[in-house]
Amino acid sequence: YLYIFGDNIEETLGKTKFIIFYFLTGGFAALSQAILDPNSTIPMIGASGAIAGILGAYLVLFPKAKIKVFFWFIIFFKIFKIKAFIVLGGWIFIQFLSFSHNYLNSGGVAYAAHIGGFISGVVLINLMKNKTRIKRKISRTSVPNSK
């Protein structure tokens, strides 16, 4: 996910702001996990919450970008191009479903971190978008192509 979506966000924000954005969303993701699942005894490790923040930013900045999606069922497979708001909207919906289903079972995946990272990415990029430099850069950037 970072490879597919991260480069567009980095290009829009610039390297320094991207790194700050990445660590901030990762911090909010960890905080969300700690608040929403305070009794968890499973250690939290990884970058998925920060990457979820990148996905949230991508949804805000490039909702109409087409993402290549590979569908496979037994011997049938096909590659579709689907708009980012559908792909990422579906992804966050699955995170909410998984969190609610696994809330009592504690399945070892930090779904609350994914949700918190995604939401913080949406909020932070909207705050940063209000800066004129970011606005101009977004308007000049064409809709990115999927890799």
Regions found by a protein language model. Give the residues of each.
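A detector for small-residue-rich transmembrane helices and their helix-helix packing motifs
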Residues: 1-146
